[in-house]
């Protein structure tokens, strides 16, 4: 009886389903195909005309073949229950039922591509990879998404050495089975015409194609010459210092001016936090081996005043899956929905399932796809004052006094109802966290934000962490790609150097840029470009 019922249901599902399997991108990995083979009939009893539905253009990422739709509404439920954005819905009834966007708008959320994965048929497929390859032709490669600090697990599917598509790889501890559109579709940039495919050397003001040996030798010669000059200058400075000590005289103004005009022998390396751990480690080892500690990966940061007391590495302070178990959270300087979409899904689960009190302090109002307890938006220069007010409320709850480093800011803060509410929610929660986001890391008073946020976390017994810029900021610190520490946070016997802000005012003899576009990736890009062009 059960099998007969299943066969009958399959007949209904297949009544209007077209025989598109030979040309459908879902062919070979289609759930409807699998179920039809197991429970379907060899011959259909249906002889009437099949339903035809005109396809909708719902954006540049998803292709619709709505005649194939079996009205399971998985895509609708994903938007409503998981993503928190109702972009797709079903209109009409019976045979006239139709999956579509509301008011014929485009699907443009940060997680829209997951509708492709949950669709059991070929009604929703990836537009960039349409008709590019069959599922069984492609080779599957495990890798990690490189666009944020979450590190979503993915599969890259290739055909004859060409990337065809990227799909999520299940990992319950990180991205579960979901993937952001940025991680899913960014592979299209791999074959961009703007990318270099061969080394180039500028000769007489023009870029010329070169072979690898010539390019690498040129770079090695320039850094070697700078290192030799630096060694000579260091020896001369030491000899001059010894002579001054012997004569017990300070250098004259003329001697000081002459020293300033000396040809610069400073070397530097600016490395991207999207680089691999191996690249970052080798870059700092190369530069320090040449006698310079001027290496930095914190390219978007401008306040380095507290780097001497910073942790070994900036990290979340908890497991990613712990985010969905929170009862309260305060995110400072974070548009987490766009910057770390997978982390935002976890916070949404906490807000919807646990009724967690999630609060934000930002320089502008951002849209979030879950209930927000407190959403404070102030001018960027007022963020420290607002955070100090929350800290004041937290100290009042704990009964402790603020440490000397922040006592002045806390005592002058004007505490409002929203500040009290945030502190109370963190204090009352069984599981709470305070997190600094990308915007906080780029703030001109980042050190003040950090010390205040840490104080709030301590007084309310919350965890403290960072949602960092790029894919591998923590790895960059661990690898020693910062000027004040070596690998694994070591401080002993390490050649220290200048941070990126100081280097923008420095004359450089040689500079290594690793995965960096200096005119867009650096906080003070204008000053750096002037330094590099000097």
Predicted segments, located by residue:
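Catalytic alpha/large subunits of respiratory electron-transfer oxidoreductases
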Residues: 14-18, 65-66, 72, 76-77, ...
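Conserved alpha/beta enzyme-core scaffolds, especially Rossmann-like or related mixed alpha/beta domains
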Residues: 62-65, 90-95, 231
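Short hydrophobic beta-strand motif reused across regulatory alpha/beta modules
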Residues: 88, 124-125
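Aromatic/His-enriched, Gly/Pro-containing loop or helix-boundary segments
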Residues: 1, 97-111
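Signature of N-terminal electron-transfer/Fe-S-associated modules in redox systems
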Residues: 1-52
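Flexible inter-domain linker/hinge segments
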Residues: 32-58, 144-158, 218, 227
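Short, conserved phosphate-binding/catalytic loop or strand-edge motifs used
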Residues: 49-56, 86-99, 302-304
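Feature of Fe-S/electron-transfer and energy-metabolism proteins
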Residues: 22-43, 59, 141-142, 164-177
